[in-house]
Swiss-Prot record:
Its EC number is 2.1.1.177. This is Ribosomal RNA large subunit methyltransferase H. SUPFAM superfamilies: alpha/beta knot. It is an enzyme of class 2 (transferase). PANTHER family: METHYLTRANSFERASE, RIBOSOMAL RNA LARGE SUBUNIT METHYLTRANSFERASE H.
Length: 159
């Protein structure tokens, strides 16, 4: 399986980089995983609603440019469907069973994802009703993908 994670914003925190590197290493025996980091749109602090929309649209264009036509796209969004780790594992397994060998997860910037990215997405996933830093979501997502592979193979880890 080929998994891409497209994320807006440069990761600066060393501890997050280390955690991400660890899970990429662990995942290497299950799937080919690629993390694509795209620059965020520079914007002043107090944006109007129209300015926020423009920022999301510009970031959305960058994201859509990196998504291939043959991939199953899962957008990470606070309004997405919440799943348990086991339900998420079943979703990953079903995609593989039905011939979806490419999955792309999309993590937006601090303002979220554009409507065009949401339209392109096959599904929307939420890890919490709480707002989480988009940089932290990379690590959380990789851990859950790793956990899903372990669950699907009946390997210990997820308890």
């Amino acid at each position: 399986m080929n998994i891409s994670i497209i994320s807006i914003g440069k990761l600066k925190e060393k501890y997050l980089k280390q955690g991400i590197a660890e899970y990429l290493k662990r995942l290497s025996s299950y799937a080919k995983v690629e993390v694509i980091e795209l620059p965020d749109e520079k914007a002043p602090e107090n944006l109007s609603a129209a300015e926020m929309l423009i920022v999301k649209e510009k970031e959305g264009i960058r994201i859509l440019d990196k998504i291939s036509d043959d991939t199953h796209v899962i957008a990470l969004a606070i309004e997405g469907k919440q799943k348990s780790s086991e339900e998420f594992a079943v979703s990953i397994d079903r995609l593989a069973t039905y011939g979806k060998s490419k999955i792309t997860f999309v993590i937006g910037g601090s303002l979220g994802l554009s409507s065009e990215v949401m339209k392109r997405s096959n599904e929307s996933l939420s890890f919490s009703k709480m707002t989480l830093p988009h940089q932290l979501m990379r690590l959380v997502l990789l851990e859950q993908v790793y956990r899903a592979f372990r669950i699907n193979r009946g390997e210990p880890y997820h308890k």
